[in-house]
Amino acid sequence: MGTHARKKASLLLLVLATVALVSSPGWSFAQGTPATFGPIFEEQPIGLLFPEESAEDQVTLACRARASPPATYRWKMNGTDMNLEPGSRHQLMGGNLVIMSPTKTQDAGVYQCLASNPVGTVVSKEAVLRFGFLQEFSKEERDPVKTHEGWGVMLPCNPPAHYPGLSYRWLLNEFPNFIPTDGRHFVSQTTGNLYIARTNASDLGNYSCLATSHMDFSTKSVFSKFAQLNLAAEDPRLFAPSIKARFPPETYALVGQQVTLECFAFGNPVPRIKWRKVDGSLSPQWATAEPTLQIPSVSFEDEGTYECEAENSKGRDTVQGRIIVQAQPEWLKVISDTEADIGSNLRWGCAAAGKPRPMVRWLRNGEPLASQNRVEVLAGDLRFSKLSLEDSGMYQCVAENKHGTIYASAELAVQALAPDFRQNPVRRLIPAARGGEISILCQPRAAPKATILWSKGTEILGNSTRVTVTSDGTLIIRNISRSDEGKYTCFAENFMGKANSTGILSVRDATKITLAPSSADINVGDNLTLQCHASHDPTMDLTFTWTLDDFPIDFDKPGGHYRRASAKETIGDLTILNAHVRHGGKYTCMAQTVVDGTSKEATVLVRGPPGPPGGVVVRDIGDTTVQLSWSRGFDNHSPIAKYTLQARTPPSGKWKQVRTNPVNIEGNAETAQVLGLMPWMDYEFRVSASNILGTGEPSGPSSKIRTKEAVPSVAPSGLSGGGGAPGELIINWTPVSREYQNGDGFGYLLSFRRQGSSSWQTARVPGADAQYFVYGNDSIQPYTPFEVKIRSYNRRGDGPESLTALVYSAEEEPRVAPAKVWAKGSSSSEMNVSWEPVLQDMNGILLGYEIRYWKAGDNEAAADRVRTAGLDTSARVTGLNPNTKYHVTVRAYNRAGTGPASPSADAMTVKPPPRRPPGNISWTFSSSSLSLKWDPVVPLRNESTVTGYKMLYQNDLHPTPTLHLTSKNWIEIPVPEDIGHALVQIRTTGPGGDGIPAEVHIVRNGGTSMMVESAAARPAHPGPAFSCMVILMLAGYQKL
């Protein structure tokens, strides 16, 4: 080849190398130069719902991508490139698309953003721009709705044209008097119609439907014309439920969406709503008695058939429908940025889940990719043969079904590089152990892959019994000796060029274990030490590591069972503390330096309680028995002696041991019969094994089963009753809990008769939750005794009957008023009232008396009331006004109410006590007593007389106060010599009660010295307050 030709070839190689370097992600010619990479979306457009009547004059669809060099943007609408010329209604601001003055006819559609730079192009996910609207209701008057009182009724909403869906409320007569959502009223959020299960007089009026549209940044509401509801008066009749608001036979939903099923029925009494899942169990968190069943975030487990049941005492009605759950595409496997050598093969794959199953297609730089030449497209697989530089670019895997489309993006960079050791040279210093083995890596960066040669000094190395060069270029030297020391060089070459890198091999003494661990056999809870000692090259550090069944042991785990020796570098003993069964296995001690290592093994056997049995299977299911079988678990090196069976039910959730046949289950058994179960009950079972070392962990629970149905085996309890309206017999009982119902179609059978009668009447009350029955008959006299019995039933038959209970019909108010009522004021705020008792009559059980009292001149309707707790014939009434005349009446009462009033009596409360405390207090102090004196308190004309004074005394030695009474205006109080502090209160007393106190504080300072402070309590009304303080320093006493 001539000089000119060689220069031309060299230049071509340089150009190729330059192209390859530039095409490589992350490559830069100088430190700090930004890497080149394709667009990566940081913000993609999302769908918008734009109100047609919005005051906003533009819509913005966001798009932003990170790229180097920075990306440029363009947009597609409905798959066609958009004209984004300056001055048009569609403007590009950065990557965002701004639509000016949007209209439905011109701008509704599907939008996509495309981001490009020299590396390639990527396409965003689709964003749909929709336009929402809500028209006004018709201006025509609505026809009145007529029905009979007690019947059910539906008022149609007939909403105007709209998009998207609406929410609904109803007004009664005026805004904002909204119809409540209760068991009797229901507003369908599907149709907007208002349903009333059973009408009554309170429902009369004018009704208007309020429809509200919620859009992305706007809310609008419209009202319908009022429609009048008229009710024809009629004695309400009882009728069975009839479901009027029904959910459809099929409801489709996407995973994660909220699903709402509506169900509402007419009926009298108002029906109870109950939901269940026909082909599975309804999650407890969705269980409800409301007219709507809401699943906030539906999943595939929620798919199935659902039933709504409306039930009252006259019958039941049901409706069924199926929820079908589907899903948008979701990635299971995606592609990632890839660097590949020129001329190599590449396979990319992506996979997506969804329902229906998503279809997968591929894009390259935003354009569809099909099989051609070296590229093969097979659904989720993309395969390249003999990659070339033009295969570099941005690729996208697209998965789509009818519910949505998802995109996964990645950059493919095809490289052509001469060998280069700058990033990964051969290790400069390579220590190795004598007699051991060393692997020296040779990993230059090169594309295509370089050919590797090794040399020691000037000698080229080939494969031999001790030396091997692997296919990836690694040099392996075995059975190392001192003669192997020296320089080793790796030579790498491909069609782009060549390079080499050198390292120096240094040979060291080998590591040896001098005391190996020994195998051992221990019980659970024992401690054990495994010894491990080693020798090593003194110029290097030695470390010990331990593994159990080839997994490293974590010595730093809090509360762990392992400890290791740390006294000497050559000792690596392992101690096992409080051994468990899981600590048995193969222990390996490894002694290592940076150049070599060696290991020894020992087996530790830990005997313990058995492991959990497996595969618990339930078969031969009866009403009270099942047959269990299981497989043996590990005996943990000690024979299994017996098995224990347990069961749990949903009501309790607690595991309980069950009776079995045989009673004692031996260790070689793998089946047993369970006895004494409850019929029609969900059960799970588990099995535990025991040996001489204890009982092991139980098995996992069996699959849940339900025992067969049987007739009820217990009678309802808590049979009682009473109360209600005249002519009624109310019978109450405690509902039978789920575990005693024994079957579906559960209810109650009542038998009752008047006491002394020979014939029984019966009534059937459906529903397990029922807890009362009302029997009405105008011929029933007040407080008539009835004999009552109850039993439960299910679809298998009737259960046992309860004992007979005596229940009384409704009471009526007492018919006789108390006589000889007497009342007299006893203080300024109290009066005493007495009367003659009322004889018990046949209307009911007399509970006590009600006293009504009101001020003279007031209306009796404003009277205050107080009741006695029993049959006392006198009472004290408190909280009265002083010097006030009161009228008083007394009535007898029972559970039905109060009887007629007695003739009224009058009482006058006493004038109030003086509102001034005793004043001008003086005292004389001796070694053991304190004499106090004060000015007499003279009452005013509107105050009661003073008959004496009350003295309250308390000191710090005896915190319980002592009360003293005196008719004089002085008193002598004992004062112990060793007191530190005392408190005295003085107040008036008389017919009007006690007055306001004055206080005296006594503090001893030392010896016979003391400080006395008197303070008059502040009056209740505004007025002056007086206090004075005097210090006594005399050995005897001082008169103030």
UniProtKB/Swiss-Prot annotation:
Propiece span(s): 1016-1040
Keyword NAD: no
Membrane topology classification: Lipid-anchor; GPI-anchor
Tissues in which the protein is found: In neural tissues in embryos, and in adult brain, spinal cord and cerebellum.
GO BP: adult walking behavior; axon guidance; axonal fasciculation; axonogenesis; cell-cell adhesion; cell-matrix adhesion; central nervous system myelination; cerebral cortex GABAergic interneuron migration
Pfam family for this entry, one: fn3
Domain of life: Eukaryota
Signal peptide span: 1-30
Lipid linkage positions (GPI-anchor amidated alanine): 1015
GO molecular function annotation: carbohydrate binding; cell adhesion mediator activity; cell-cell adhesion mediator activity
Domain Ig-like C2-type: 39-130, 135-224, 241-324, 329-413, 419-506, 511-605
Residues with glycosylation annotation: 78, 200, 206, 463, 479, 500, 527, 777, 832, 920, 942
Role of this protein: May play a role in the initial growth and guidance of axons. May be involved in cell adhesion. In conjunction with another transmembrane protein, CNTNAP2, contributes to the organization of axonal domains at nodes of Ranvier by maintaining voltage-gated potassium channels at the juxtaparanodal region.
Protein's name in the database: Contactin-2
